């Protein structure tokens, strides 16, 4: 399955690894990828609306007519429906029971049980009284959709007065509560780390720990950036160990091949596990890992899911550590007048003709410009990120 805005060449990767493979790409009629870009012999099936139940029905029809050996997706929004297809038609890979634990943020917290870093304290919500109780028990709250992604729909409520104000000003919040679609967790003021992992069975093949320069939920007022942690630092070692233990505890035959974990560090240095997704990290995570480790997480996870990739015994860095920055809702960064060698990637996507870039991003990965830089260590990477604002 390929979302209409994706241009990744999954079919080419599979075809190169196994020229005899029969490949079908399910997408929508408005897909950005032209048919001519598909690998030789690839069948393309389109639907009018990729997000609709009709697209899921089309997937089921394909499975019923010619049961595939594997189904590959790389979007959080496709995880559950692909998993349901595997469960319904007996297809190997991530099934719906396990997939639900990666999409429901309450079930998700149970995946962290018994690990060195505990899950952030949280509560299920069904009404306004639950919100008041959560604020009394946990203090400042983050309220978010149980199945959300990209930090959309996230709000921070400081206390009971903020709870009341939010419910009065936005009655739709109560509707969401009554439908059981929201959850609350303690707001942890401090640093947010992310750990990106390539997985094969009970082994973490590659673990790359980083920290965001600003919490992702602040994308409307800040710019989202990320800096790779120094590999020998105590924080990197703890996060790597936690990620490896997380992988080792997954159920047998889980079908997960890539993970994006997020950890919260408060001002005292205490760590909590926040979220985990079984897909490649967004923004420039893939670019950063590829530059430093020489491994494309999307390609590797795709081929692992098809049984067509033999991973190296011990991945070793092929380049220096990296950091990246998105221009979201914060100050405008820019390329220095004399472009330095350490700026390894820069892009500023142009809006469709006749349209201007939106002033307000709609998610944490919605950006007007993207920068990928390299450096010797965290300190140098941070300094070079600051140089991107030197002309501002």
Language model features: what each stretch is:
Residues 1-98, 308-310, 374-389:
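ATP-binding N-terminal substructure of ATP-dependent carboxylate-amine bond-forming enzymes
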Residues 87-153, 158:
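A conserved helix-loop-beta module that forms one wall/lid of the active-site cleft
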Residues 112, 135-157, 175-190, 195, ...:
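ATP-grasp fold ATP-binding core
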Residues 114, 131, 302-392:
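Peripheral (often C-terminal) accessory segments that flank ATP-dependent C-N-forming ligase machineries
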Residues 118-120, 141-143, 156-190, 220-225, ...:
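Conserved ATP-binding module of the ATP-grasp superfamily
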Residues 186-254, 273, 277-305:
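ATP-dependent carboxylate/phosphate-activation module, predominantly the ATP-grasp catalytic core
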Residues 199-204, 266-269, 329-330:
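Short acidic-glycine loop/turn motifs at beta-strand connectors
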Residues 253-267:
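A short glycine-rich, hydrophobically flanked beta-strand micro-motif that places a catalytic Asp/Glu
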């Amino acid at each position: 399955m390929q979302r209409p805005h994706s241009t990744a060449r999954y079919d080419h990767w599979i075809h190169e690894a196994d020229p005899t493979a029969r490949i079908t790409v399910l997408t929508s009629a408005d897909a950005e990828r032209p048919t001519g870009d598909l690998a030789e012999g690839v069948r393309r099936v389109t639907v009018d609306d990729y997000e609709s139940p009709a697209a899921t029905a089309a997937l089921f029809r394909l499975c019923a007519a010619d049961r595939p050996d594997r189904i590959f997706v790389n979007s959080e929004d496709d995880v559950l429906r692909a998993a349901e297809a595997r469960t319904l038609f007996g297809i190997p890979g991530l099934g719906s029971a396990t997939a639900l634990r990666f999409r429901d943020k309450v079930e998700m917290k149970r995946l962290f049980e018994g690990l060195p870093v505990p899950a952030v304290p949280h509560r299920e919500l069904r009404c306004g009284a639950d919100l008041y109780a959560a604020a009394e028990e946990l203090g400042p709250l983050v309220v978010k959709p149980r199945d959300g992604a990209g930090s959309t729909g996230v709000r921070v409520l400081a206390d009971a007065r903020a709870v009341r104000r939010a419910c009065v000003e936005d009655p739709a919040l109560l509707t969401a509560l009554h439908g059981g679609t929201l959850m609350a967790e303690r707001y942890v003021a401090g640093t947010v780390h992310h750990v990106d992992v390539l997985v094969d069975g009970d082994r973490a093949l590659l673990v790359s720990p980083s920290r965001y320069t600003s919490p992702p939920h602040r994308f409307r007022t800040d710019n989202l950036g990320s800096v790779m942690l120094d590999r020998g630092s105590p924080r990197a070692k703890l996060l790597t160990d936690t990620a490896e233990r997380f992988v080792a505890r997954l159920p047998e035959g889980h079908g997960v091949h890539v993970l994006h974990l997020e950890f919260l560090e408060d001002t005292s240095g205490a760590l909590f596990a926040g979220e985990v997704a079984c897909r490649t990290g967004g923004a420039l995570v893939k670019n950063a890992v590829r530059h430093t480790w020489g491994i494309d997480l999307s390609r590797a996870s795709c081929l692992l899911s098809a049984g067509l990739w033999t991973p190296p015994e011990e991945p070793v860095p092929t380049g220096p550590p990296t950091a990246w920055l998105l221009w979201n809702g914060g100050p405008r960064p820019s390329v220095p007048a004399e472009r330095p060698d350490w700026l390894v990637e820069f892009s500023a996507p142009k809006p469709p003709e006749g349209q201007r870039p939106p002033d307000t991003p709609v998610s944490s990965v919605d950006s007007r410009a993207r920068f990928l830089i390299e450096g010797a260590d965290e300190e140098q990477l941070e300094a070079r990120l600051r140089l991107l604002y030197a002309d501002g």
